[in-house]
């Protein structure tokens, strides 16, 4: 690698001959597109005089050639290590079923590999490493816990305060067999939850060496992949709820593992903080306060390497912010708008996309990875040097957007899908999924130029990627679906109200 200010070897177009490989198809690989996006961001930063580290074209060619060979062989995504999969992008390589039925009341089951019952109530999504699938659940001693889904504005907490058992499950991915289960914590909940939430909202994370279960006020638990407890960490009791109201809605931010570091965004009414722990032993590496930056948030942070630096990007209110991974130093901030931040920031094609849409403003931002300082758009021009573009009024409340082939797909909690040019912010089309009578909370995923959107009632809409709307199918899960799906080796894995369901062509 060349340091900033030195002479790189070459940065012109690569002269390598990749032969008969379909380069257009290879570029659609999320692995390749993320790599190319990071490279472009670094090159742009260098051209603008920003401190950065650039890869030489020879290094890039060698890396791309290796990735292209794997992609050309038809390799499918195997590991889905945390919320929304590799790099939190919600995009996978391979091919998955586009038509199925998991509802026995609607006829014969179709393209269902297995369906395993999971006791209790949770919105945590599956995390997958090789042939192991992990989920968490909260099992109430008072029996089935109440859950109210749909479109409503009631903010009162749920009546679900009896003793709970927080359980971590490991399933065999190919069969659905439960390999092991561990009770991480047992006791009365230390905080209340929203009527649409659960006491186990956070998706576990794994790096193949350890599994992290984050249970909010009930602590952090690290296991090896055989279920042996490695360490625990108590981060205190949180007060998660909207600012200015005597309400508690529970926590929902999921843990992120990156290079033996565990990153946790812990936002609440007072004393919000971002903390990085050693994934090996739970030792605190650094902590930075976020009071005044974010008074509450239910979003999962994203780790982004681009423009010569690695940063943690946190959705929040009143500010979205980026932090230096090594130290916790704030790099930039952006006045958000939506006062109940939920979506995760996403990095694709050299830009950071982030949205929040509860309350009055509903912004959608495309942030430059070399942003610095306060990059809030100027009120008169709606522009900022730190933004590539900015859409002030059509962001998403619950769902995290998906970026695929230079298009950004953003779905509202009422099922209104808006598709933008990811580079310019130009609106390509608007279309409603469903009849507008059900909520959409699960974040979508993209596989093989198709996108999958699940309603809270368990209806999954499959659309063709592109600048024009084309509905390919509508499929049934047979239960309430709030969690976001996982993808591994050409199969879909949905967490529903009472099951984990594996969907694959049969």
Regions found by a protein language model. Name each.
Residues 67-75:
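Hydrophobic h-region of N-terminal signal peptides that target proteins for export
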Residues 27, 32-36, 58, 246, ...:
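Compositionally biased, low-structure terminal segments
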Residues 5-9, 14, 19, 25-29, ...:
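Short, low-complexity intrinsically disordered segments enriched in A/P/G/S/L with frequent Arg
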Residues 75-506:
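Noncatalytic, solvent-exposed loop/strand surfaces
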Residues 21, 28-39, 50-56, 140, ...:
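N-terminal targeting/docking segments
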Residues 60-67:
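Sec-dependent signal peptide recognition
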């Amino acid at each position: 690698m060349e340091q900033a200010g030195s002479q790189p070897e070459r940065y012109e177009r690569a002269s390598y001959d990749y032969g008969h490989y379909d380069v257009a198809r290879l570029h659609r690989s999320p692995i390749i597109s993320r790599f190319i996006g990071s490279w472009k961001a670094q090159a742009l930063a260098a051209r603008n005089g920003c401190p950065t580290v650039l890869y030489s074209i020879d290094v890039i060619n060698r890396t791309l050639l290796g990735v292209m060979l794997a992609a050309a062989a038809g390799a499918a995504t195997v590991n889905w290590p945390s919320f929304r999969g590799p790099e939190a992008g919600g995009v996978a390589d391979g091919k998955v079923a586009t038509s199925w039925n998991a509802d026995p009341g609607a006829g014969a089951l179709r393209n269902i590999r297995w369906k395993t019952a999971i006791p209790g109530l949770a919105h945590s999504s599956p995390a997958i490493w090789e042939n192991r699938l992990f989920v968490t659940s909260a099992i109430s001693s008072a029996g089935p816990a109440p859950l109210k889904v749909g479109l409503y504005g009631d903010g009162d907490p749920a009546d679900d305060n009896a003793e709970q058992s927080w359980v971590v499950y490991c399933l065999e991915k190919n069969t659905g067999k439960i390999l092991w289960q561990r009770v991480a914590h047992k006791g009365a909940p230390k905080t209340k939850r929203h009527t649409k939430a659960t006491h186990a909202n956070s998706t576990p994370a794994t790096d193949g060496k350890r599994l992290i279960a984050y249970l909010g006020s009930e602590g952090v638990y690290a296991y090896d992949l055989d279920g042996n407890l490695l360490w625990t960490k108590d981060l205190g009791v949180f007060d998660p709820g909207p600012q200015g109201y005597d309400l508690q809605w529970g926590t929902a931010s999921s843990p992120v593992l990156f290079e033996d570091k565990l990153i946790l965004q812990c936002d609440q009414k007072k004393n919000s903080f971002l903390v990085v722990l050693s994934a090996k032993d739970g030792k605190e590496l650094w902590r930075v306060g976020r009071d005044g930056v974010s008074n509450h948030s239910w979003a999962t942070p994203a780790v982004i390497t681009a423009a010569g630096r690695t940063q943690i990007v946190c959705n929040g209110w009143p500010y979205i912010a980026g932090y230096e991974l090594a130290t916790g130093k704030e790099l930039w901030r952006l006045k958000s708008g939506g006062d109940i931040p939920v979506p995760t920031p996403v990095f694709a094609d050299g830009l950071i996309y982030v949205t929040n849409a509860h309350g009055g403003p509903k912004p959608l931002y495309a942030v430059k990875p070399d942003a610095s300082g306060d990059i809030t758009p100027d009120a008169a021009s709606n522009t900022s040097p730190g933004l590539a573009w900015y859409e002030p009024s059509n962001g998403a409340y619950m769902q995290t957007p998906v970026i695929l082939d230079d298009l950004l797909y953003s779905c509202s909690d009422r099922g209104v899908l808006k598709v933008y040019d990811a580079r310019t912010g130009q609106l390509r089309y608007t279309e409603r999924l469903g009849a507008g009578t059900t909520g959409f909370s699960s974040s979508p995923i993209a596989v093989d130029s198709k996108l999958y959107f699940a309603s809270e009632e368990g209806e999954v809409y499959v659309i063709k990627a592109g600048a024009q709307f084309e509905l390919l199918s509508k499929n049934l899960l047979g239960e309430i679906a709030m969690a976001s799906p996982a993808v591994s080796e050409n199969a879909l894995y949905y967490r529903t109200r009472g099951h984990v369901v594996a969907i694959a062509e049969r």
